Amino acid sequence: MAEGAALRALRGCLAAFPREARELGSLESIPYLDRPPSPLEFYREWDRFVMPEERQMPFMDFLDIVEKKVTSPNIFYVQKQCSNLTEEFSELVCDVQPDIPWMSEALGKKPDAVNFWLGESAAVTSLHKDHYENLYCVISGEKYFLLHPPSDRPFIPYELYQPATYQVSEDGSFQIVDEKSADKVPWIPLDPLNPNLEQYPEYAQAKPLQCTVKAGEMLYLPSLWFHHVQQSHGCIAVNYWYDMEYDLKYSYYQLVDRLTKIVGVL
């Protein structure tokens, strides 16, 4: 009964969002994006960690692509991890809560960032973790999460990659350009939906959780939890990042992480 009441309370919190915020797909309620979008999606091309190309375009043009009014072979995703809702979509700030009051009260702080997400179904966020307490609110569509608790760290591989960026050439094709002066990036090489257990046999011991977050629902994603994210086409979401406390939980994770690295070297 208590869990059911809590779930109803969360849904009620999201249901209180104004209709304009829940129906951002209507052209009248969409502002223009006047800065380059910065997707979270990272691409792994063999031995490189390739950041996506960033493109400046009117937001209306982006919507035409998502709604298939314009054909494009590329994958488009609007996301920038620096509170882009408040920085780039100021017209919508009054339509979405600036924070989640009960979470702010529980943590004794306001969110560091409020992020806006909108993209195609082909845009996938690879497995990673964040140093934030994350409240993920789906306004339209669905998000599909695959989750690992921090205790699964010994079974999750990391490798070092040469950082690079996709750039568009004059003929419209993409080329990968290395960032030669940058240090190599540690990243998870494994696709949790289709893991190569011959190459990474330890992952077979991990216990992934999967959940679907539907419109009007909210997911609390604790800091340091690994997550891989997919979405339905045109899914609209807002998430709230609260900085984590670097307390005993963080120290425990650091211990597990370092022991995992030591064992991997031996």
Annotate the PLM regions:
Residues 2-218, 226-266:
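N-terminal accessory scaffold of Fe(II)-dependent oxygenases
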